[in-house]
Amino acid sequence: MSNEHGVPAPTLASRIHGCLLGGALGDALGDSVEAGPTAGTRGPSSQAGVGGFDDLSGVARFGDDTQLTLYTVDGLVEALEWANSGVGADVNACLWLAYLRWLASQGEEAPPSAPVPQPRWIDGHEVLRQRRHPEKDCITGLASGEMGTSFRPVNPEAKGVGTVMRSAPFGLVPHIASDAVYKLSSDAASLTHGHPSARQSAGIFSLLIHRLVSGAALADAAAEVTADAGALPDAAPELRERLEAALRLADKREAGPERPVQVLGEGRLAEEALAVALYAVLSTAPAEGEEKQPDRHFRDAVALAVKHGGASGTIGSLAGNILGALYGEDCLPAPWLAALEAPEVVRGMADQLVKVTTGEG
């Protein structure tokens, strides 16, 4: 069985590892762009076609995007562990408890009304306790001590990237319906963000990952989730508009530096970051009939994503998630992986998700 462009279809385990590691790589590269020389890196070259870990000095550190993505994995793993043992569990409650443990790792305290979660394997890693410029709304939403729901979300006006940046793992769970993937993701987004565009962006991003993991071609999956975004009850118009713009812009392959920002936004809001990442992976994809190595597509897409500006770490992370889910871990450039901070932690969480979903490992 082959994937698009003649690339052999990856296994589910490879897609899970590829998605999580790809997101961490994009996050690390994007964070280096945001921080620049103050982070002890030179940052990507501004020359066209250049940009990657080859341009960095020292270890490439990922940010809060990857931290929260891994805690999303942990919450899902706990819920699936309960389910596999024959005990039903509230998935969103498991995710809330996981996020509360992340909150504590950042030196923040939840009010006494919030539960005190029991520690798990993920909590023993120093790299996940480092404070890496966490998104404000994630902190305030969790520190409220309230478990937000889709009917009563916390931070009702929050529409930043903190939802979409952590939502790839929902799309990695196999054998569940698309509407269930969307609900899991958007419900979890309600734990920290209340604005419809932030919650719907998270759900649509998870659906995109789900379709890719299920074997859909990249362009087909992108078109499908764009249509899904417009068909949602009480659909946020800005999400559909940004995604449609990303498809149009990628199709025209207009690579001028100003136009993507004008059309897609700066990338600081959830729907903008998703649209920019989608544009980056589509506009760098091989043309029909063209042979292209997956690792080159990954390099080109992530480099373009992080050059956009705005929340570069998030945009790079989303692009890395998408291509890792599409191609599996074979698309990840070996030199980039060698430079990545704590890949064993990312792999460890990927292994746990593989085990509870497939029984492997």
Model-derived features: positions:
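Structured, active/binding-site neighborhoods that engage oxygen-rich ligands
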Residues: M1-G361
